[in-house]
A protein has these predicted regions:
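A short SAM/SAH-binding and catalytic strip from SAM-dependent methyltransferases
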Residues: 97-106
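Conserved N-terminal segment of class I S-adenosyl-L-methionine
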Residues: 1-89, 95-97, 112, 179, ...
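Alpha-helix N-cap/helix-start and coil->helix boundary motif
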Residues: 41, 62, 102, 132-134
Length: 257
């Protein structure tokens, strides 16, 4: 569909740079857009409210979708099965966003194949992932596997036992937190391997960018903190993203036959 250059919009000052990148790729477009792994709506509601895109959301987490439905009752959202096919027909969408989702799934190739199926010819995939770099060992999503007792202690101290149980003990939806059951490593990608993975599944990267270097040092404290301290730490993350490009990878890729 038609596209014009877009500014970062409502995410220009957001500490997570992936949203500004995705906004720039998508906000000037029209047609049907799917935010795959939309969560409870950090990105999709803004895109739905401020652009001409016909937005759809999909996620396997029922709690996230319930929160998103309350927030945007007019936004069509669908619950996915972790190990199932996408519940959409062939060439159903003109663009798909996959923002820090690919690293959570057990079979990346299968998911990319499904995205290729539901995108129309020449459709746009906007993809963000963590990039493998010097500080990848600090990835907090791997703490639950490497240090399970410490992870449980810290998480329950901050959010409570019930929230921990709902997020990590109950795997009835094939999820452990945001990670698919059967996946025991939050993948951090090298640029050549991600580009090759995309090309192997019918996507040609057009834009590759990145952000951050030291943000992992601030991310966990920011997740656990609140109020002014959290705002300060998120400001550090934002500034880190302004200066460095090594820790996250952002890709806009076209579907090819």
């Amino acid at each position: 569909m038609a596209a014009v250059a877009a500014e970062p919009g409502p995410f220009a000052r957001h500490h997570l740079r992936r949203y500004a990148f995705a906004w720039q790729q998508l906000a000037g477009r029209d047609g049907r857009h799917l935010d795959l792994g939309c969560g409870d709506g950090d990105f999709l509601p803004a895109l739905h409210a401020a652009t001409s895109l016909e937005c759809w959301g999909a996620d396997p987490h029922p709690g996230y979708l319930a929160a998103l439905r309350l927030r945007c009752p007019d936004l069509p959202v669908h619950q996915l099965q972790v190990f199932g096919e996408l519940c959409f027909g062939e060439a159903a969408f003109d663009s798909v966003s996959l923002l820090d989702v690919l690293e959570h799934v057990p079979d990346e190739g299968r998911l990319l194949g499904e995205i290729h199926r539901v995108l129309g010819p020449g459709g746009l995939l906007v993809l963000t992932v963590p990039r493998r770099h010097f500080f990848s060992f600090l990835d907090p999503d791997n703490a639950k596997f490497r240090f399970p007792r410490l992870h449980r202690l810290v998480y329950t101290a901050r959010f409570g036992q019930q929230v921990y149980a709902e997020r990590f003990a109950d795997i009835s939806n094939d999820l452990r937190g945001d990670m698919s059951v059967g996946k025991d490593e939050h993948t951090n990608y090298r640029r050549p391997e991600l580009i090759a993975l995309l090309r192997d599944h019918g996507f040609e990267p057009e834009t590759v960018a990145g952000a951050n270097l030291f943000w992992r040092w601030f991310q966990v404290p920011a997740l656990l903190a609140g109020g002014r301290l959290r705002a300060l730490l998120e400001r550090f993350i934002y500034l880190d993203g302004e200066i460095f490009t090594s820790a996250n990878m952002f890709v806009a890729a076209r579907r090819v036959p």
